[in-house]
Amino acid sequence: MTSVVVVGTQWGDEGKGKITDFLSANAEVIARYQGGDNAGHTIVIDGKKYKLHLIPSGIFFPEKISVIGNGMVVNPKSLVKELNYLHEEGVTTDNLRISDRAHVILPYHIELDRLQEEAKGDNKIGTTIKGIGPAYMDKAARVGIRIADLLDKDIFRERLERNLTEKNRLFEKLYDSTAISFDDIFEEYYEYGQQIKQYVTDTSVILNDALDQGKRVLFEGAQGVMLDIDQGTYPFVTSSNPVAGGVTIGSGVGPSKIDKVVGVCKAYTSRVGDGPFPTELFDEVGNRIRDIGHEYGTTTGRPRRVGWFDSVVMRHSRRVSGITNLSLNSIDVLSGLDTVKICVAYDLDGQRIDHYPASLEQLKRCKPIYEELPGWPEDITGVRSLEDLPENARNYVRRVSELVGVRISTFSVGPGREQTNILESVWSNL
């Protein structure tokens, strides 16, 4: 067995797609295990950017299998659009496999997402309005429609009619909104199902067979640990489990078959939407980081909130996700700053704490305790080894590793594949 999990350690947008793409070169199967098209990842190949939301980053390797696992919620309309986009770019998708157990996002999920968010008023969570939460709600309530159901016209008709009856009562009676027509959904979405039918299978069999045969399998997480519904900044979280433990549920692969967990982080922190963010910057330094780092959401286009690197967050992520290796991205974005800061602990009502509180009220009162390091003026985008980094940048990388308590396997000085520097192979000793 040879398997590696890639997880985001912050609030998403850490560069997981880039690292997954990088590690995919030595994998034979690449699988996603949770989330939906609310998460976007950008891959740069030969200077060209590709933006994906559902399909795993490994799709760009035609000889490798890319898997959409059972833990995902799939909007068939978005998936077909993404497939067409790849085809137009000359990318084959013959290597894609979709779990027949994955749940389907339908228009009523998106409408319910919108209405629920509007009803919260000033207490909005900041959802992407992609229907993710309502789809997972239906899954937990055991009324969800799965990919396998979508492919069977009679079953899809029966379950869609049942669900629409219930949802329309909600829309009309609770939200004073307009009902959704069965006819507006049924034929269109059944046709989407037929367009993806060739890719649908029991992906748990594919993944376990690959591992049993000694093949290298890479699991690609979406969002980040701090958006995990159990371990994140609840309720400002996603509706699934991005933590490494989510792999076993979302892929049908047992925990004994997971070998390493790579935590991906940026040299600073960013967040989309509302919720606690102790190291958030509101000054010109924050604006500079946002602009240089192109911190705008892949899915929403919204400006991301940015702040200093938070080792409290990172140690929390390391603990709950069992991180064995770290990939540190976007060090180049900090170039040119006179000083750089790292949050080493929090001050909570005059007491120093080293853990991340569960209470939102406590988090609001947490003040970051910073360690300040000298910056570096040099352009480091051409650096190809740790030794080539300026001394101050090198010290920053080492200090991050010390504070998090995990060795750094790769560091990146730009978005390109060639700008990822290897300190040790993640696939070694497996």
Curated annotation (Swiss-Prot):
Gene Ontology molecular function: adenylosuccinate synthase activity; GTP binding; magnesium ion binding
Active site annotation, chain numbering: D13, H41
Residues annotated to bind substrate: T298, T299, T300, G301, R302, P303, R304
Cofactor note: Binds 1 Mg(2+) ion per subunit.
Residues engaged in binding IMP: D13, E14, G15, K16, N38, A39, G40, H41, T128, R142, Q223, T238, R302
Keyword Nucleotide-binding: yes
CDD domains named among the record's database cross-references: AdSS
Binding-site list for GTP: 12-18, 40-42, 304, 330-332, 412-414
HAMAP family: Adenylosucc_synth
Record protein name field: Adenylosuccinate synthetase
Organism: Streptococcus sanguinis (strain SK36)
Taxonomic classification: Bacteria, Bacillati, Bacillota, Bacilli, Lactobacillales
Gene that encodes it: purA
